[in-house]
Regions:
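Bacterial N-terminal signal peptides
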Residues: 9-18
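Active-site recognition of the HExxH zinc-binding catalytic motif
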Residues: 163-183
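Post-HEXXH active-site segment of zinc metalloproteases
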Residues: 178-202
Length: 323
């Protein structure tokens, strides 16, 4: 038991210790050839589940525990505000992820299966093994009731249950990570294994922080530290397992203790990073240095933003309203 506790502490420290330290220029992604005219540009699709009083009430009750440890009342609220939708849409558009379907409080197993079949990015073998397992989880334990915000790389869809921009952009960052891989099916499947899955969470959180800093969006950066860090701490404490899965192999009291410990560790790290960044921001304000600490020093011939992919012009950096 003592050995397991030390291993858990080591995993938590190594995972959380790598966050909040981004210093390289933020890289916007480019995965498609740029449209020749604004009319040809693909826009982000949002699909919404239909209201159901009884189902929505049950979902709200089931989600109560999940709102406690991340210290945010809008986690698994099964609602998406216009402001949050616009922030998510801007991230997806800025990183050329307009092919990602956003499902807001929606349950559509038939549609998910069809999208998985049509997803040419993922190899056949991965789609009908790991992809099918993911589809079964979506079908039998629907986020429409049990909550959860997650990107499914096999169907290329993002399921949304929370009204928290930091959480949604972190999951969207995983979509960016998947799109940038030469072997996305292999990468996605490997990252489903316990412990290994922490790697993709860490990369996504760091991308979210880098994006927030480049956009000079202190509210988003602060929310990432305050809300996503505790959630990542829980993941690290569970070793990347789900709480349900661990209950089957560990004493039932061990799982909640691990979750609380991970959340407290994540909260502590998050508040430490917030305090450090607030000090930096105040110092920069007094000396008129840009808030974005990750901005590279460039000359007239260089762009301040690094891009991944085809185009050379950085995407629009001002949030756009949804049509």
């Amino acid at each position: 038991m003592a050995r397991r506790s030390w291993l858990m502490i080591l995993v938590i420290n190594s995972t959380l210790g790598s966050l909040g330290c981004a210093t390289t220029p933020y890289k916007y992604s480019r995965f498609h050839v740029e449209a020749s005219s604004p009319e040809e540009r693909q826009t982000v699709q949002f699909e919404y589940g239909k209201p159901h009083r009884g189902l929505d009430r049950a979902a709200w009750i089931v989600a109560l525990p999940s709102r406690i440890l991340p210290f945010h009342p809008k986690v698994n609220s099964h609602n998406l505000s216009q402001e949050t939708a616009e922030k998510l849409e801007h991230y997806l558009e800025a990183n050329d992820l307009t092919d990602v379907l956003v499902r807001v409080n929606q349950y559509d197993p038939v549609g998910e299966w069809q999208r998985m079949r049509e997803n040419s990015r993922i190899a056949f073998g991965w789609k009908y093994t790991f992809g099918t397992a993911n589809w079964l989880g979506y079908t039998l334990i629907p986020s429409r009731v049990f909550g959860g915000d997650y990107y499914n790389p096999y169907s290329n869809s993002l399921s949304v249950s929370s009204d928290v921009p930091a959480i949604l952009i972190t999951e969207a960052a995983y979509a960016k990570d998947i799109h940038s891989q030469a072997l996305p099916g292999t990468y996605a499947s490997i990252n489903q294994f316990p412990v290994l899955t922490l790697w993709r969470y860490t990369r996504a959180v760091n991308d979210s922080l880098g994006y927030a800093r480049h956009q000079d969006d202190w509210e988003l950066e602060r929310e990432t530290c305050a809300t996503v860090f505790p959630m990542l701490g829980i993941q690290a404490a569970l070793g990347g397992h789900t709480a349900t899965g661990l209950v089957m192999v560990l004493p039932s009291i061990t799982v909640p203790i691990a979750m609380i410990g991970g959340a407290v560790a994540g909260h502590t790290v998050g508040q430490t990073v917030i305090a450090k960044r607030e000090h930096e921001i105040e110092s920069r304000k007094s000396t008129r240095i840009p808030l974005n600490s990750s901005e590279a020093e460039t000359d007239d011939s260089e762009s301040k933003t690094q891009l991944v992919g085809f185009t050379e012009s950085p995407p629009d950096e001002k949030p756009k309203g949804r049509p």
